[in-house]
From Swiss-Prot:
InterPro entries: EIF3B (IPR011400), eIF3B_RRM (IPR034363), Nucleotide-bd_a/b_plait_sf (IPR012677), RBD_domain_sf (IPR035979), RRM_dom (IPR000504), TIF_beta_prop-like (IPR013979), WD40/YVTN_repeat-like_dom_sf (IPR015943). The keyword Cytoplasm applies. The gene is prt1. This is Eukaryotic translation initiation factor 3 subunit B. RNA-binding component of the eukaryotic translation initiation factor 3 (eIF-3) complex, which is involved in protein synthesis of a specialized repertoire of mRNAs and, together with other initiation factors, stimulates binding of mRNA and methionyl-tRNAi to the 40S ribosome. The eIF-3 complex specifically targets and initiates translation of a subset of mRNAs involved in cell proliferation. PANTHER family: EUKARYOTIC TRANSLATION INITIATION FACTOR 3 EIF3 -RELATED, EUKARYOTIC TRANSLATION INITIATION FACTOR 3 SUBUNIT B. Its main location: cytoplasm. Keywords: Cytoplasm, Initiation factor, Protein biosynthesis, Repeat, RNA-binding, WD repeat. It comes from Aspergillus clavatus (strain ATCC 1007 / CBS 513.65 / DSM 816 / NCTC 3887 / NRRL 1 / QM 1276 / 107).
Length: 741
């Protein structure tokens, strides 16, 4: 608020008196921080009280605990002694770094020293900060207990009687959530201005909608989208949810500066870039410095700035582990919810370039113990070949490796159920003048994890995508770019499926290749079978091809032995398309052109899975379209089987409901037209009544409106101040046209 006379205090009115000037804000700003330099010290309470001659023995015993979380020495432990030559039951300990002191507080606080004594560990600067005079009220005041408030149902949208889906729209400075109504206009649920400053993002199961602000992240949910949680992270730029919505990761390029008195962030987060949060409690679990922003000392000017790797932390399928990579050196795996390093050490992997968790918990053949799988790759180093490896966690055992040669780049693609991992290997020729791609497919569920090689590709693969919950995939290849060519080379789209071998599936085989395309993106339906292959972020091509992988028509003879029947259903164009999104049911597809990419014809179009356009929605300053995800089904496998068995009966009910909805819509239109007609007739009747009253008032006959009689009627003259009513009628008797000159 801007200062004004109304906001001045009584003391401010007498500011000419020097002794009454309030300089508390200046004192706070320039106050010498006594804790500076003390951030490596901790205070340990709860120690045994021993005589001075036993003090050194106690220190040595205590060192066993202290050195498990950092590095300190006996000389760095100070244990005060009183006048009776007895210790006071506490000690001051100095660690080498502030991080070690923080680790000591986190890991040693509350741990037993022996059967009778429990360690209480605090930072020395905390004692100074919170124990300073005036910081603690000496008089006990009972805490205020807030009245109970019933929580909103965070998954209420799933109980919609018509099983509709919701989506979020971000346009201009407004964010809205809407129901999808098929052919009819969407129904608004909530629409708010300035709801976010950067972007919005749904949580993986659709429970929360996250908005991003300079102060941090807020989560919204429930029928009215009320505020549920907030996570303070100044100038946050990126966020990532864990698969089960238990945790949230936030990142900012600016190191955090924690102000004193901040209720949630502590000195532990000061100077960090990344925070891992517990969504349920709203509290940070641990904070980290971003690897991408730090450069070796003295080399920061010479080295180019690294691209930020996001997500910086990757989650296991069951959220029990989260891992982070220091590129070229190691992979650090943390156990949740404590966020302690698995085995207290990182996994050293020289040259590691990337890693990916399996998106599902996999039961490998012959393996009975619990495990999560992690795949990583390393480049060629000296005479050592490039390597792809699969690691089992928590044992950290390497269960499969594959050596690769002449490697330029590798991309790891897990199938959604963790049954396969495709290693896309870009290889260069010995002369390094040409590139080609081959696929190394790990069959994870089979004994020994065999690897199948697809080496029939002649060009470089620029995009690859597995069918969700399936064993088919689509890829796009790109020919070599001719130096100096003004036009980019054409692409080719290839469809792959497995062979039929008796009752089991065999190797992966090419089904069909579509040449001379401009496609660069692949979007599978979340339910599989249907796929959109499109050209996005292009200035010259905007095609969207809708494909069916299980076409029910006749199958070509050459594809009889393959588990696919590929058919192009429709091709559409959407000028300037930048994004394509499937709804969670796989029935609808939205193509959109975002103002974040360009400012030409922004908006979004709704299509069916087969490519029929339902609506076109040009929207000024359109930015984001996001379908609300659905959680996994709550039905058991037996119940799902029963639903599929009775699907035809359910379909009849759904068709009847659709017809009823159309009838209601038509009835509404008819009723509206009837209402408008009734209003028009009532208005005509009312006007005629008023006109009749006017005729009686002026003594006019009822048939005065007849034009013929009105022409011959004499003018009414005014006598004694009465008004004269006169009607003039003109008629064109003859019309001639004369041309002059």
């Amino acid at each position: 608020m801007a200062p004004s006379f109304d906001t001045l205090s009584e003391q401010d009115l007498h500011e000419e008196e020097e002794e009454e000037i309030d300089v508390s804000d200046l004192k706070a700003q320039y106050e010498v921080k006594l804790e500076e330099g003390l951030d490596t010290f901790v205070v340990i309470d709860g120690l045994p009280v021993v005589p001075e001659e036993s003090r050194q023995k106690l220190v040595k015993f205590l060192m066993r605990k202290l050195n498990t979380v950092g590095h300190t020495s006996e000389d760095a432990v100070f244990m005060p002694v009183n006048d009776k030559n007895m210790s006071e039951g506490y000690a001051f300990v100095e660690y080498e770094t502030p991080e070690q002191a923080v680790a000591a507080v986190k890991q040693l606080h509350g741990t037993p020293l022996d059967k009778k004594h429990t360690l209480l560990v605090n930072k020395l600067m905390d004692i100074e900060r919170y124990g300073r005079e005036g910081r603690i009220d000496e008089e006990y005041k009972p805490p205020t207990i807030e009245p109970f408030k019933e929580k909103e149902h965070l998954r209420s949208w799933l109980s919609d009687p018509n099983a509709r889906d919701q989506f979020a729209l971000y346009r201009g400075d407004k964010v809205g959530v809407f129901w999808n109504n098929k052919n009819n206009p969407p129904e608004n649920v909530v629409d708010r201005a300035h709801w976010t400053q950067l972007f919005v993002q749904w949580s993986p199961k659709g429970t929360f909608l996250a908005s991003v602000h300079p102060q941090g992240v807020q989560l919204w949910g429930g029928p009215a989208f009320s505020k549920q949680k907030q996570f303070p992270h100044p100038f946050v730029q990126l966020i990532e949810f864990s698969p089960g919505e238990s945790y949230l990761t936030t990142w900012s390029a600016r190191p955090i500066q924690v102000e004193e008195g901040q209720p949630i962030l502590s000195y532990e987060e000061d100077g960090k870039n990344i925070i891992v949060w517990d969504i349920e409690t709203g509290k940070p679990l641990r904070s980290f410095v971003s690897h991408d922003l730090s450069a070796p000392g003295g080399e920061s000017d010479a080295q180019p700035k690294k691209k930020v790797q996001w997500p910086a932390f990757k989650w296991s399928a069951d959220e029990k582990y989260v891992a982070r990579m220091l590129q070229g050196q190691s992979i650090s795996i943390y156990e949740l919810p404590r966020m302690n390093l698995l085995g207290k050490t990182s996994v050293k992997v020289d040259g590691v370039m990337d890693f990916e968790w399996s998106p599902a918990t996999v039961n490998r053949e012959g393996v009975k113990q619990y495990e999560q799988l992690l795949c990583f790759w390393t480049p060629e180093i000296g005479s050592n070949p490039a390597r792809v490896a699969m690691m089992s966690v928590p044992s950290k055992e390497i269960v499969r490796t594959r050596n690769l040669f002449n490697v330029s780049d590798v991309k790891l693609h897990w199938q959604s159920q963790g049954s396969f991992v495709c290693v896309k290997v870009d290889r260069h020729s010995k002369s390094k003048k040409s590139m080609a791609t081959n696929l190394e497919i790990f069959r994870v569920r089979e004994k020994g994890v065999p690897v199948e090689v697809v080496d029939s590709l002649k060009d470089t693969v620029i995009n690859f995508a597995w069918e969700p919950n399936g064993s088919r995939f689509v890829l796009i290849t790109n020919g070599e770019t001719v130096a100096g060519a003004a036009v980019a080379p054409k692409t080719a789209v290839s469809f792959f499926a497995r062979e039929k071998k008796g009752g089991a599936a065999g190797n992966f085989k090419l089904v069909r290749t579509i040449e001379k395309k401009n496609s660069n993106a692949i979007y599978w339906s979340p339910k599989g079978r249907f796929v959109v292959v499109a050209t996005v972020h292009s200035q010259t091509s905007f095609d969207m091809d809708f494909w069916d992988m299980d076409f029910e028509g006749e199958k070509p003879e050459a594809e009889k032995d393959l588990t696919a029947n590929v058919q192009l259903m429709k091709t559409l164009e959407h000028y300037g398309v930048t994004d394509i999104d499937w709804d969670p049911t796989g029935r609808y597809v939205v193509s959109s052109a975002s103002a974040w990419t360009h400012s030409l014809e922004n908006g979004w179009n709704m299509h069916t899975f087969s490519g029929n356009t339902l609506s076109e929605n040009p929207t000024e300053k359109f930015k984001q379209f996001l379908w609300r995800p659905r959680p996994p089904t709550f039905l058991s496998k037996e119940e799902q089987k029963q639903v599929r068995k009775n699907l035809r009966e359910y379909s009849k009910e759904f068709d009847e409901e659709d017809r009823y909805a159309v009838d209601i819509a038509n009835t509404a239109v008819v009723e509206k037209r009837k209402r408008v007609l009734s209003e028009w007739i009532a208005w005509i009747r009312r006007e005629k009544e008023l006109l009749s009253e006017d005729k009686d008032a002026y003594g006019l006959p009822e048939d005065v409106d007849d034009p013929k009689k009105a022409k011959d009627a004499p003018a009414v003259t005014s006598e004694q101040g009465e008004a004269v009513v006169e009607e003039i009628v003109e008629e064109i008797v003859e019309e001639s046209e004369e041309v002059i000159g």
